[in-house]
Amino acid sequence: MPIDNLPPLREVIDIYGLQAHKSLGQNFLFDLNLTSKIAHQAGNIEGKPVIEVGPGPGGLTRALLAKGALVIAIERDERCIPALLAIEKHYPKKLKLICNDALKQNFSKLFETYPEKPRIIANLPYNIGTQLLLNWLLVEPWPPFYESMTLMFQREVAKRITAKPQSAYYGRLSVLTGWRTTAKIAFDVPPQAFIPAPKITSSVVHIIPRIQPLTCSAQKLSFVTKTAFGQRRKMLRQNLKTLGGEMLLAKAGIDGTRRAETLSISEFVTLANLVI
């Protein structure tokens, strides 16, 4: 059943000549049943502000608007703007378009005058998805400018985001995500839901900020985790040599022969708090 009376997305892509560009990490999501499922995963968004990054031809945008959201869509690719303007005309005063690179967008400033925090709901471009997430995880002040994030990533990235200690996917991204938020994989999205179809499965991850994460400098924790996971197979006393090595680990009560993937988030926080 159609969510609106706008043309089907395949038709929109043809009308505006929107071939996905690999250089922009684009894979257009055209299955409107799935876009509605993503919008539903974010909870009740009627009358709520929503940030969407990389809307492309507007498949997810339409699902968000159909559920009553007030959408602020940030799109770098100017080719997509005419298709998005057609959606804006269909939903007057419900869609705001910003033509900008999301990596350069000051999100905190954009929403400082809004009466309530936005939710971030997006099928993120593959080539900038991880960096955008890191930017949003490390933003200051905390609690952040957003209420929650419902984001699509490559399945492997989603596993890294939600991984636990002692697992192959556990790494810097897992620690930084788990420190400040709770995250879960909501569902998978098959390749055939996209144009063009990628070679891998994607996953939607739902992320909610912790109001009071363990006290720690975001910059220090980011640096310590980057250093600790620099060479995964090496012992911590080797990887953390430049930060104090055995002495630092002894202060933290951590065995220097352990590897980074065995440490809990709280142990990483302890290390970061000891770094001068």
Curated annotation (Swiss-Prot):
InterPro entries according to UniProt: KsgA/Erm, rRNA_Ade_diMease-like_C, rRNA_Ade_Mease_Trfase_CS, rRNA_Ade_methylase_Trfase_N, rRNA_adenine_dimethylase, SAM-dependent_MTases_sf
Record bears the keyword Cytoplasm: yes
Keyword Transcription regulation: no
Gene3D superfamilies per the UniProt record, alphabetical: Ribosomal RNA adenine dimethylase-like, domain 2 (1.10.8.100), Vaccinia Virus protein VP39 (3.40.50.150)
PANTHER family the record matches: DIMETHYLADENOSINE TRANSFERASE, DIMETHYLADENOSINE TRANSFERASE-RELATED
UniProt-listed Enzyme Commission number(s): 2.1.1.182
SMART domains: rADc (SM00650)
PROSITE patterns for the chain: RRNA_A_DIMETH, SAM_RNA_A_N6_MT
Cross-referenced SUPFAM superfamilies: S-adenosyl-L-methionine-dependent methyltransferases
Subcellular locations according to the entry: Cytoplasm
Keywords from the named record: Cytoplasm, Methyltransferase, RNA-binding, rRNA processing, S-adenosyl-L-methionine, Transferase
GO molecular function: 16S rRNA (adenine(1518)-N(6)/adenine(1519)-N(6))-dimethyltransferase activity; RNA binding
Family to which the UniProt record says this protein belongs: Belongs to the class I-like SAM-binding methyltransferase superfamily. rRNA adenine N(6)-methyltransferase family. RsmA subfamily.
Catalytic activity, as annotated: adenosine(1518)/adenosine(1519) in 16S rRNA + 4 S-adenosyl-L-methionine = N(6)-dimethyladenosine(1518)/N(6)-dimethyladenosine(1519) in 16S rRNA + 4 S-adenosyl-L-homocysteine + 4 H(+)
Species the sequence originates in: Bartonella quintana (strain Toulouse) (Rochalimaea quintana)
Main function: Specifically dimethylates two adjacent adenosines (A1518 and A1519) in the loop of a conserved hairpin near the 3'-end of 16S rRNA in the 30S particle. May play a critical role in biogenesis of 30S subunits.
Name assigned to this protein: Ribosomal RNA small subunit methyltransferase A
Binding of S-adenosyl-L-methionine, residues: 27, 29, 54, 75, 101, 123
Record GO cellular component, one term: cytosol
